Amino acid sequence: MTEAGNNYSEKKTQLHISVRNLVEFIFREGDIDNRSSRAMSADAMMEGTRIHRKIQGSMGKEYQAEVPLSLVVEGDLYELTVEGRADGIFTEDGKCFVDEIKGMYRRVELFEKPVFVHRAQAMCYAYIFALQNNMETIGIQMTYCNLETEQTKYFREEFSFEEIKKWFDDLMEEYGKWATFQCEMKNKRQASIKELNFPFEYRPGQKKLVSDVYRTIMRQKLLFMQAPTGVGKTISTIFPAVKAVGEELADRIFYLTAKTITATVAKETFALLEKNGYRAKTIQITAKEKLCPCDEMECNPVTCPYAKGHFDRVNDAVFDLLHRCEMIERDDILSQADRYTVCPFELCLDTASWCDNVICDYNYVFDPNVYLKRFFQEGIKGDYIFLIDEAHNMVERSRQMYSAQVYKEDFLTVKRIMKEHSRSIEKALEKCNKILLGMKRECGNYTVYDTFGNMVFSFMRLMTLLDEFLQKANEFPGKKDVMDFYFELRNFLNIYDLVDEHYVMYSELEADGRFMLKLFCVDPSLNIQKRLDKGKSAVFFSATFLPVNYYKSLLSTKKDNYAIYADSTFDSKKRLLAMATDVSTRYTRRSRSEYERIAGYINAVVTQKIGNYMVFFPSYKMMNDVADIYCEKYADETELMLQKNNMSEAEREEFLDRFSEESDRTLVAFGIMGGIFGEGIDLKNDRLIGAIVVGTGLPQISNERTILKDYYDAENGCGFDYAFRYPGINKVLQAAGRVIRTTEDTGVILLLDERFWQREYDLLYPREWSDRKPCNIANVGKLVADFWEQI
């Protein structure tokens, strides 16, 4: 391969790789080993933006910080852009150095030499800079800085241009077969997309939907789409995204969803396009616990043969798998892992790096602990399209991902374990515990703080000591607890680095007596936007995306995002939507008489037609209380089934299997709004013919909800809406949406709470609910009977 400067050829395929991904991919070797904190330290080095800024700011005005560098390397069929961002470039005594900064919790004075891949990263930047500036010599500086003490250690090396050029040429030679393969794969993909047509006849309004998505991608914007059930949202987002890739508007599609069923639909949609001539690599990332072949996920060469020598074999395993499979399934990953004796989960992640379409959970893109660093860790914008399904889940999920907490009691647990192993760690834990004890004594129910400053410095000191100890530690009783604590504390400190005006820091004395400190991300919009900025465009879509301005404000910081409402193709005459006017689930109204009325409503609906019904409650307590009354009064008329807390996968499947289309007795299933059956289940046709939603779904009052309310009262005067009403109505809409899954379905939806007729709720309903009807306990039976008669 030869360098082509930055003059692109029109004939050759354009490829890209980051400097970091290049060196980590080529130079990895040896075992997976989670027994020490070495792997953890590598992650810690990726953090520490505060240290980066501080070091860069202290180096004087001649120091250039965050210097973007790129080089086009020419192959026979392709031009490969190698790109990245050097932490710093400076000149000293007439010599030029490229600086690579790494923050960590380890004591830097213990470093005898730089980490190999860090050195290789700096050498890549040094070569590019030397080549583009006609330099005869170039130096690199590795700057390691302790995040707690800010103690710094430097390593310097100097190279002639000939030396560093030979090193870089050898590196690119090693990567050559991968670049050639990627080029051939991309050319096949692009040619196939040109000939690809929409695989169905367009439904009414669907062609406009496809055009809106394509236009969003073309303009590199964000789109928020309210997409009612039945509009074909999966194909209507995937197809235009694929066509956009064919037009070189992007290079990779991430389809993100929190539910297995929607991931399966996405996979089936890509497979359908493949049957129609589309040629691309598609993979669904499976959770580690579902891929790990071991009873315990102990990722080390002693307990797991797949971990021993994993990095020596995994590149060959990936190369072989990519040559054999287009649609890469879980079974393909498992069999390939067996064939090459490599970790199936790591194989899955590595294979995803070479795939055109990646179907995965939100956390693989957004979670700061889990995100796919091979795609998102560099400061370079990727050619990615994000298709984010069931996006109403993103608000709460992102709050969880960008928040962190620690418990005082865990410090004491680890202190007892470490007493036998390290006096210095025991003392550091004792110091942290004393600080937490003082905060606990001052805390009533919960306390909000402006800063955790002094305490965080004590946590950093503890992290340094733990990191050093775990580097050398063999097995000892309680080590797993210590490792878990290490991860929790490290996450807390990493999240603390993100804390700004979008966070609330508070302590809470929980009901069981445990004392918690929390960094609560009340507004995740900035953190999400930073990750979205790593791609070209994003489409958020959901069947329950109302009010859309609420989601726009919490999922992005941009003010020029698009929003559309896809027209429903469903015939509203095939669905009865009724809302009660004479029942309430307010706390002040909850009583046996009110529960008897609710049970009466349920019976009046389900006895009009034999079939399967679901009733959704705001809590297990109310569900059980109403179930007792329902059994007393109506047990002989129907079969009753209740959702249980913490159901296993097998129990969930058994629950859903009871919903048969061919039944001669009515089944009534009680479940929880917002729970495992409240959304994400797909009971089509006559498997479910009615849903009754009890209450407005308001989250239970808690300290966290109070903090949210106070924050948004101050922010925009909508505290109750943001903390309670909007999350509640989403659960209601999701539960109601279990009935109508296709344009052929028929069914009854009944909402039981007089508050549903208030103006505040009236403004939140989808357009398709304009035909809602009032009802009461006296006439609801006739209303439902008349509906079934006209059907």
Regions found by a protein language model. Give the residues of each.
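Mg2+/Mn2+-dependent nuclease catalytic core
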Residues: 71-165
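A substrate-engagement module of RecA-like helicase motors
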Residues: 190, 196, 249-358, 363-366, ...
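Metal-dependent nuclease catalytic cores that hydrolyze phosphodiester bonds in DNA/RNA
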Residues: 1-96, 120
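A contiguous, basic/glycine-rich beta-loop/short-helix subdomain that forms a polymer-engagement track
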Residues: 333-353, 358, 369-376, 469-584, ...
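Walker A/P-loop
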Residues: 218-240
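Signature of the SF2 helicase/ATPase Hel1-core->accessory helical subdomain module
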Residues: 237, 264, 338-357, 361-464, ...
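Conserved pre-motif I regulatory segment
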Residues: 184-226
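Conserved RecA-like P-loop NTPase helicase motor core
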Residues: 581-593, 644-757
